[in-house]
Amino acid sequence: VRIHLTTFLLGIALITGCTKTIQSPREALIEDDFAAKTFKTDKEGLSHLIALLKTVHGNIEIKFYSKESPNSVSKIVGLIKKGFYDGLKFHRVIPNFIIQTGDPTGTGRGGSGKLLKAEFNSIPHIKGTVALARGEGPDSSDSQFYIALTTLPHLDGKYTIIGQVVKGMEVVDKITKNDIIVSFSIKKK
């Protein structure tokens, strides 16, 4: 009887192991179909839509380059609206370079589970530039993004730039590794 029970349990484990894994609620989030191309923009090409990133150090406001990176902006705005970033860590902080977040695992290897095709553009990396982090391949961006702490011309044309910090750069400069995003939301101008 013990052998049959063990065989039965092993069989159940094998069958269960072969089924599709269930994603956590954060992994299962998929962006809404926001038409970023239709967002109104100012003379600098930045959207009127403002993302408010609240940290323990204060608030950061970001506007998006919705015409240059419509699919990437649509995805990030969708994730923001669903609360994906709330409570996540800034898992990568390199002084005089970047701060990075957007990984639910906090390791730099996680994301929302849906990769994006690159939308490289001619916007330069200046202080406060917001761009999507990626792996080795150009089409490997997901939910992780970074904010440039200085001008980074060697990154120009190699990463999808999605926005610019328009208020709170002094807050960005205070972020340290493992600081938490209190909340990330969208507000209208």
Q: Which residues does each predicted region cover?
A:
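Positively charged n-region of N-terminal signal peptides that target proteins for export
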Residues: V1-L5
